[in-house]
Amino acid sequence: MKPSLVLKMGQQLTMTPQLQQAIRLLQLSTLDLQQEIQEALESNPMLERQEDGDDFDNSDPLADGAEQAASAPQESPLQESATPSVESLDDDQWSERIPSELPVDTAWEDIYQTSASSLPSNDDDEWDFTARTSSGESLHSHLLWQVNLAPMSDTDRMIAVTIIDSINNDGYLEESLEEILAAIDPELDVELDEVEVVLRRIQQLEPAGIGARNLRECLLLQLRQLPSTTPWLNEALRLVSDYLDLLGGRDYSQLMRRMKLKEDELRQVIELIQCLHPRPGSQIESSEAEYIVPDVIVRKDNERWLVELNQEAMPRLRVNATYAGMVRRADSSADNTFMRNQLQEARWFIKSLQSRNETLMKVATQIVEHQRGFLDYGEEAMKPLVLHDIAEAVGMHESTISRVTTQKYMHTPRGIFELKYFFSSHVSTAEGGECSSTAIRAIIKKLVAAENAKKPLSDSKIAGLLEAQGIQVARRTVAKYRESLGIAPSSERKRLV
């Protein structure tokens, strides 16, 4: 077989850099998009943010289109916006066509947060240790701060630091005393008894219960730090020390018999124990709050549901007319080429944002159209909805709908929800209809909330109650939905009343 050159004709899809940018912007969340826009503003001199009150003309029509896409509320899906065809690459025609199912969106003003921690002042009558840790201080640094303030020898301080290094984020000691002793410098000649003494000092630090080796010890440490006049303190100490397993199994009859307590008395003892923290370290090791900025706002006006983009989260970008006017024709100098390329990128970026906004509006409008029952009556009125339904309604591919509904949020009178929340599978009803799995979860949650606390509903009983309402669901499915709601099994929901 001889090597030869062969010419073939064919078609091949090519993903241009501009197309890649449009897809990437489509799947970004509002906060990520804000960062992307900020980076574009810093790197491209042709881009500028249009602030409220700016009254000078903007010569770039793409920027005007981006602002229009972020305005007026929608009552029905948007019509496809026309994009001009490009026959020549003149200075005024740097943009190319983006497919209609590739999109645009939003952003918000930069938020800079500063935090500081300080020691309690002499004027503070009462000091809350959590006030010092509100800025996100770690548990280890908080414990070391207390150790450094405590009077102790250098050897004890070294032991204390080693112990603190063995405490996990929940506040429990993960290593045995022998392992801690082995980690200490042998030249210090430390005995095991010394490690245990220092551990007891660590266990007196805040938060209460820190440095415990198991749940029982953690609860006992917290109870022993309560005032001696605390009602039912002795009974709580005895219950945790001797009968914690019975409490975990909710065997209240055995607890009342062994502790010789009446039902009302046992309830008060349990309430005292429930005030304790099973994971004391979590009071310090709190992750930084995650903020959600809704992309879409839904409101009701004259019995109609209106959809609009969140103006507070909308970027208002435009091409800087002054710099754009400096681009000269037939000038191949390095400076002019740079300015021309930046102008092209700026126009593409604005057009990609516009496309993102238009796609988001189309999808959000169709979701509201399908889920009017939820907006009017709540979760129990949620209808089954899949990506294919919305993709067919707006004339886009399911992958595009998946991108635009991920990490995008809708603000409704019933709360803020991710767009994916409105999609759910269906379950057949006795009448031959369909019921949303989200609606079934809402019904299960309602049934559990109204159950008798002494005789909680089992999964089989819940399945029977659903069947009585015409919804045929297997017990295993009920168990799956219950677990997804964070509801414990009936054996663990049983409590004294």
Swiss-Prot record:
Transmembrane segments: none annotated. Residues 71-86 have a biased composition (Polar residues). Pfam families: Sigma54_AID, Sigma54_CBD, Sigma54_DBD. A motif (RPON box) lies at residues 474-482. Residues 42-100 are annotated as: Disordered. Keywords: DNA-binding, DNA-directed RNA polymerase, Nucleotidyltransferase, Sigma factor, Transcription, Transcription regulation, Transferase. GO terms for molecular function: DNA-binding transcription activator activity; nucleotidyltransferase activity; sigma factor activity; transcription cis-regulatory region binding. Residues 386-405 bind DNA. GO terms for biological process: DNA-templated transcription initiation; negative regulation of single-species biofilm formation; regulation of DNA-templated transcription. One of its GO terms (cellular component) is DNA-directed RNA polymerase complex. Disruption phenotype: Deletion mutants result in reduced production of pyocyanine, motility, and proteolytic activity. The motility defect is due to the inability of these mutants to synthesize flagellin. Significantly decreased porin oprE expression under aerobic conditions. Mutants also show defect in biofilm formation. Sigma factors are initiation factors that promote the attachment of RNA polymerase to specific initiation sites and are then released. Plays a role in the regulation of many virulence factors, motility, quorum sensing, mucoidy, a general mechanism for maintaining lytic phage in populations of bacteria, and biofilm formation. Positively controls the T6 secretion system by directly binding to the promoter regions of hcpA and hcpB genes, leading to their expression. Thereby, allows to colonize several hosts efficiently including mammals, insects, nematodes and plants. Belongs to the sigma-54 factor family. PANTHER family: RNA POLYMERASE SIGMA-54 FACTOR (PTHR32248:SF4). This is RNA polymerase sigma-54 factor. It comes from Pseudomonas aeruginosa (strain ATCC 15692 / DSM 22644 / CIP 104116 / JCM 14847 / LMG 12228 / 1C / PRS 101 / PAO1). The lineage of its organism: Bacteria, Pseudomonadati, Pseudomonadota, Gammaproteobacteria, Pseudomonadales. The gene is rpoN.
